[in-house]
Amino acid sequence: MRIEQINARALEKVNYDRYLLSQAIAKRVNELINGAKPLIELPKPNMQLTEIATLEIAEGLVKVKEV
């Protein structure tokens, strides 16, 4: 799946609120940096953490709460 499609699906999960999505991605990236395991099987070996977090949100594996 292309990154544009992943971003569109992730935006859909947060009711098209770009600010909320960026905050959720940042929080998940921090969790990954601090040792959390990815919730998805990585489709390519050297994915960036922001790509992993966005894909997890798009797949519905990370729930995003309103701020």
Curated annotation (Swiss-Prot):
The keyword Transferase applies. Its EC number is 2.7.7.6. GO terms for cellular component: DNA-directed RNA polymerase complex. SMART domains: RNA_pol_Rpb6. Pfam families: RNA_pol_Rpb6 (PF01192). InterPro entries: DNA-dir_RNA_pol_omega, Pol_omega/Rpo6/RPB6, RPB6/omega-like_sf. Keywords: DNA-directed RNA polymerase, Nucleotidyltransferase, Transcription, Transferase. GO terms for molecular function: DNA binding; DNA-directed RNA polymerase activity. Coiled coil: none annotated. Signal peptide: none annotated. GO terms for biological process: DNA-templated transcription. Promotes RNA polymerase assembly. Latches the N- and C-terminal regions of the beta' subunit thereby facilitating its interaction with the beta and alpha subunits. The RNAP catalytic core consists of 2 alpha, 1 beta, 1 beta' and 1 omega subunit. When a sigma factor is associated with the core the holoenzyme is formed, which can initiate transcription. Belongs to the RNA polymerase subunit omega family. This is DNA-directed RNA polymerase subunit omega. The gene is rpoZ.
